Structure formats: structure tokens, C-alpha cells
Amino acid sequence: MSSLEKNIEYTSVSSIAGPLIVVEGIKGVAYGEIVSITCPSGEKRTGQVLEAREDVAVVQVFEGTTALNTSETKIRFVGETAKLGVSTDMLGRIFNGAGKPLDGGPDIIAEDKIDINGYPLNPVSRQSPNDFVQTGISTIDGTNTLVRGQKIPIFSGSGLPHNLLAAQIARQAKVRGSDEQFAVVFAAMGITAEESNYFMNEFKRTGALENAVVFINLADDPAIERILTPRIALTTAEYLAYEKGMHVLVIMTDITNYCEALREIAAARNEVPGRRGYPGYMYTDLATLYERAGRVKGKSGTVTQIPILTMPHDDITHPIPDLTGYITEGQIVLSRELNRKGIYPPVDVLPSLSRLAGNGVGEGKTRDDHSKVISQVYAGYAEGIGLRDLVAVVGEESLSERDRAYLKLADVFEKKFVQQGKDEDRSIEETLDIVWDILTILPEEELKRVSEDLIKKYHPNHKK
């Protein structure tokens, strides 16, 4: 768009429908372009081009279309897509979903302005994630190990404590044995005012805000802002990682609210719906978020992602978790049954998986016994869960001594390993030592997945 076209002010609004306005007679307008809107009262609002064809543009107004009309509303296309002013001064600050300060502090003095859609990352320039990130949560560090540059979602359900878990990960996550800087970028989308207050108070109470950047989009904020929030958060993360050399963990909650905003906007544009009314391009859209995690050759920083989503009706085959699973590198599944037992965090380790766990465990990263001892307790827990179904039919008295040991192991595993305090920050050594204590329930001859050398080195019965 030329400088002359940037200064053109259009008064040719032909229709207003919900958050959308249609402008006719336009020239040189591009998809995603930012729009300056002047209301009849003189108030300034901002919008974004959702569709541009020939001489017609469809614009979504961030602040809504209340008080706009077709005769007195003025439109000016600014000639560029949404950009974010970034700076290291953003650390320790809380912003709304559009990147404006929420904490009463001053506006950020930008060191750079970056397109929030990011830049295409050449696959050849990517490096494989291989460094352990400690979250202090046994069911993640032990059985579903997170590595720097990975993207692993948490699949939750309505009413489950994923917000507690998100806040705990945000304040406890760290890179072990390293002087490298670590930061958390937290993006909340479509949350209630109560949830917003919880997150803000939690970050301030624990001091986690010092090394964090927080973006909060509320449920009653515009849907288009919900689409921008994760992109703004990821742009901040990429700046801190690739320009400032920091290791950044991005936590995004709730991706389901993000997808609902996609569906709302698609319906307003009269698009042909896909599965369950979601737009057919939802897979591609989610990929533009998740694929911004990783490590880049020649850059010391990394971007690691933990997106959190609530599965409607606890349905893991729902389009949102289904498509997310195709793009990401595993999943951490929260269990309603464990939550009913009062176990926190209610992580079900059996369907959970970290596809890159093998890259971040072992001697020099966690501990030499990590993969073997976790494999052993995982197999024992799976057998114990299977025996619970058998007990429901034949009764516990019908079980052999061996079966009773595995049944006990499953119970102790949930109470000692899975369950931990909301402020309990376990080191990986503490996590693995708990596993060895649990394995004392079984006779040593049952520990077939662990070498004799490791048994002699770590088994409590062999320690002096």
C-alpha cells in the first residue's frame, strides 16, 4: 500500500453484523491488515481485515461495533499487519490479550517491533530438542519428561484443576545446573474474571512474576483478541529466546476457547463449517501456533510450549485434542477418576506420553537409572490397574501373593508418586528416589527391566 493510500479515509461502510463491518470501494487492502476506525462520537477503535476481495473488505472490530453506523463511521487502513513492540522490560509485567498493560504500569518502550504472525522457520535450521526442563512435578519430570524446544499439550476436562497445574508449572519450571536465563510466557485465553484474579494473585504471591510475562484475555473480551493473544505471547517468547538468548517456556490456556473464537469468526464470515462446526483450516491454524516452538541453529535460546486444552465432554477424539495430537509431540492427560479420589495433580500416566522424553533423560541430563526405573514402575502400575478390574469380579482374596503386590503398587504409586502438594517442587532425584521406594513392594526378581548394577546402586534395600 502506498503512503497516499494509507491516508485515505473511507466512509463507505455498507453493513454491520455482530463484530464485523463491511467496507466497499477500497483499494490495495491486504488480509490481516490493521484498521483504524473512527466512531461517530470521535472515539478511536482498532480492527483487522479478515477478508479482502476486489474492492470489498470485511473488518473485525476489536472493541465491538456498538455505537457504529454505516453513514458516519470512518475507516483507515494503516498498511501493515499487527506488530508488537517488544523489550526485556516486559518481564515482570501483566498485559491484556492485545498486549496493553493491565498492571497499572507504564507502556513498554519498544526495543523492536515484530509481526505477531512470526516468520517461517526453515526446517533445516531446526535442531532436535534434547535438554531436560524440570517442572518439579513427578508425573511430568519422571514419566513424561519435558525437553527444551518441545511442544507437549495438557488434555484436561471441565472442572479439573488444570489452572492450578498451569500456575504450578509456571512458577517451578527451570533449567537445571545452568547459568542460562529462563523465562515463562503465560497466555490465558477466554478465562473468567475469577480465573484471571487467581493467576495474577498467584504470580505475585509466589514471586514467579519476576521472570514471567503474562497475557490475559477475558471471556468477555472480543473474539478477535483471543486469536491475537497466543500470537502476541509467542512473538514475545521468540524475541526473548532468539534475540536475548533466553530459554522460554510458553504456557497457553485454554486452547479450546481459542478454537471457539475461530468458530465464532468463521460463522460470522459465513464460511462452510468443517467437523462439529469448526473451520476446515483449524488444523493449519493450530499448526501456526504449535510449530513456533523449537530450537534454531546458531541461536542459544529455545522456545518450549505447554498448551492446555479442555476436552468437551472429556472426549479425546474431539477435533481440538485430535488435531492438537497430530501436531504436538505427545500429551499429558488429566483424569477425572484420579481427581475424584482427591489426587493432585490428577495426571493419568498410562495414556500420557512425551515422544521426546528419551532425548532429555539419562546420565548427564537427569540420572543414569531414569529410563529403566520409570519403565519398571510404569509396567507395574499398568498391571496393577488391570488387576483392579479383576478384583471387582473375583474379589481380592482370590488373588495370588504376586498379584496383591502389584495391586498394592498401583495404590501406592498414585498416593506417593502422582500425588504431591500444590507448592511441592520435587527435584528429579527426589522423583526417582520415590519410584525406587515404591518398587520395594515387589520382590527384586520382579524387577526385570532394571539391571542388577542399578538395583545395587539405587534400591533402598542395598543402601547402607
Curated annotation (Swiss-Prot):
Keywords: ATP synthesis, Cell membrane, Hydrogen ion transport, Ion transport, Membrane, Transport
Keyword Cytoplasm (UniProt): no
GO MF annotations, alphabetized: ATP binding; proton-transporting ATP synthase activity, rotational mechanism
Primary location group: membrane
One CC-aspect GO term: plasma membrane
SS bond partners: none
Biological process, per Gene Ontology: proton motive force-driven plasma membrane ATP synthesis
Topological type in the membrane: Peripheral membrane protein
Gene3D superfamilies hit by this protein: 3.40.50.12240
Compartments (UniProt record): Cell membrane
Subunit annotation: Has multiple subunits with at least A(3), B(3), C, D, E, F, H, I and proteolipid K(x).
Family, similarity comment: Belongs to the ATPase alpha/beta chains family.
Function comment: Component of the A-type ATP synthase that produces ATP from ADP in the presence of a proton gradient across the membrane. The B chain is a regulatory subunit.
Name of protein: A-type ATP synthase subunit B
Organism for this UniProt entry: Methanococcus aeolicus (strain ATCC BAA-1280 / DSM 17508 / OCM 812 / Nankai-3)
